[in-house]
Swiss-Prot record:
Sites where the protein binds Mg(2+): 241, 284, 311
Entry protein name: Enolase
Family membership noted in the UniProt record: Belongs to the enolase family.
Reaction it catalyzes: (2R)-2-phosphoglycerate = phosphoenolpyruvate + H2O
Gene3D superfamilies: Enolase-like C-terminal domain (3.20.20.120), Enolase-like, N-terminal domain (3.30.390.10)
Subcellular location: Cytoplasm; Secreted; Cell surface
Organism: Thermus thermophilus (strain ATCC 27634 / DSM 579 / HB8)
Pathway named in the protein's UniProt entry: Carbohydrate degradation; glycolysis; pyruvate from D-glyceraldehyde 3-phosphate: step 4/5
InterPro entries: Enolase, Enolase-like_C_sf, Enolase-like_N, Enolase_C, Enolase_CS, Enolase_N
Sorted UniProt keywords: Cytoplasm, Glycolysis, Lyase, Magnesium, Metal-binding, Secreted
Active site: 204, 336
Length: 422
């Protein structure tokens, strides 16, 4: 009943209007699974390869080659395999690809099929996806890290840092956290309008006003939290993703919006000052992906005070994470399924992080779809935290709404850790 009898893919569009891969898997008993893959704007150099067509069509962003790889190369390999053997299915695709970064088939082709297989298996067993992936122990609803002010590569403004996030960890449930976040988001819109700033939104649904500095973004968030009736650092704290790999050139950090060029040690001192001044709970990619010595210093100075998340640093890769653990850098990993390219490898990275005392933060990408797989994944692995954008754009809300459904379905079994998740 769970034997794979059909695998096919098609080209669909993501939230930025560029093509991505959607795969469908059909099982012998009639169950079907479908999955779409996201795409990042600021990508780590160590990520698995997203296969694009090049040429004029879709400005070079087409994915016909990846779709063809699913239909003509992956499908014949997987037909006849058991969808319940996720590791076996993923291993077969990895062997077929034969490269360390999935450059042959494309991580977008491999991942779409990998996720669709899991969905089909869950459907065949009559289980919700989070229960299939996590068993009876997957009951933790994540604290949302809501990207409400966008800068860097996610927006056209003078803000160097990419994401300024609300963390409504003082809530008692996911539903309450979502409500608090929404109230602050709408209050922030009113504050921006009052100050004459644009309320246009960036890729992830956050506002992208042309602010004068990175610090102004933080001050506006604190004002919005207070205006909404909450206390910064209590009901709502802050998280940052400065995406500093995008600012790192010739061994220095170039904060062009502020006219500063900082060394690694100066960048660490910068973060120390901000953590002292503001209610910051988490800093993601506070230093560049290959600045290992800088990361060691950052972890030494701030690792006991705030969550230090490696995104470009680890790229959801168990080998990169192992190296980081051995060197004692960061204390959390950002998990993006398309950075590594299969569900099995993603779960391996999460398990390694959790065994090693590192937090795992499940994350979307800036180019998203209506697929809500990561919402179920966050609950399944008891991640405790999720990054899936702001309180606008339906591609972001799809994940939040799925989490609301899961919390309702779990009922009294649902757990929400709040600040204990950090």
């Amino acid at each position: 009943m769970t034997t794979i009898v059909g695998v096919r893919a098609r080209e669909v569009l993501d939230s930025r209007g560029f093509p991505t891969v959607e795969a469908e898997v059909e099982l012998e008993g009639g169950a079907r699974g479908r999955a779409m893959v996201p795409s990042g704007a600021s990508t780590g150099t160590h990520e698995a390869l997203e296969l694009r067509d090049g040429g004029k069509r879709y400005l070079g962003k087409g994915v016909r080659r990846a779709v063809e790889n699913v239909n003509e190369r992956i499908a014949p390999e997987l037909v006849g395999m058991d969808a319940l053997d996720q590791e076996g299915v993923d291993r077969a695709m990895l062997e077929l690809d034969g490269t360390p970064n999935k450059a042959n088939l494309g991580a977008n082709a491999v991942l779409a099929v990998s996720l669709a297989v899991a969905r089909a298996a869950a459907e065949a067993l009559g289980l919700p996806l989070y229960r299939y992936l996590g068993g009876v122990q997957g009951v933790t609803l994540p604290v949302p890290l809501m990207n409400v002010i966008n800068g860097g590569k996610h927006a056209d403004n003078r803000v160097d840092f990419q994401e300024f996030m609300l963390v409504p960890a003082g809530a008692g449930s996911f539903a309450e956290a979502l409500r608090i976040g929404a109230e602050v988001f709408h209050t922030l819109k009113a504050v921006l309008k009052e100050k004459g700033y644009s309320t246009n939104v960036g890729d992830e649904g956050g506002f992208a006003p042309d602010l004068r500095s990175n610090e102004e973004a933080v001050e506006l968030l604190l004002l919005a939290i207070e205006r909404a009736g909450y206390t910064p650092g209590q009901e709502v704290s802050l998280a940052l993703d400065p995406a500093t790999s995008e600012l790192y050139r010739d061994g220095k950090y170039h904060l062009e919006g502020e006219g500063k060029v900082l060394s690694s040690e100066e960048m660490v001192a910068f973060w120390e000052a901000w953590v002292e001044k503001y209610p910051i709970r988490s800093i993601e990619d506070g230093l560049a992906e290959d600045d290992w010595e800088g990361w060691r210093l950052l972890t030494e100075r701030l690792g006991g005070k705030v969550q230090l998340v490696g995104d470009d640093l680890f790229v959801t890769n168990p080998e990169r994470l192992r190296a980081g653990i051995e060197r004692g850098v960061a204390n959390a990993i950002l998990v993006k399924v398309n950075q590594i390219g299969t569900l099995s490898e993603t779960l391996e990275a999460i398990r390694l992080a959790q065994r090693s005392g590192y937090r795992a933060v499940i994350s979307h990408r800036s180019g998203e779809t209506e697929d809500s797989f990561i919402a179920d994944l966050a609950v399944a692995v008891n991640a405790g935290q999720i990054k899936t954008g702001s309180l606008s754009r339906s591609d972001r809300l799809a994940k939040y709404n799925q989490l609301l459904r899961i919390e309702e379905e779990l009922g009294r079994a649902a757990r929400f850790l709040g600040y204990a998740a950090f």
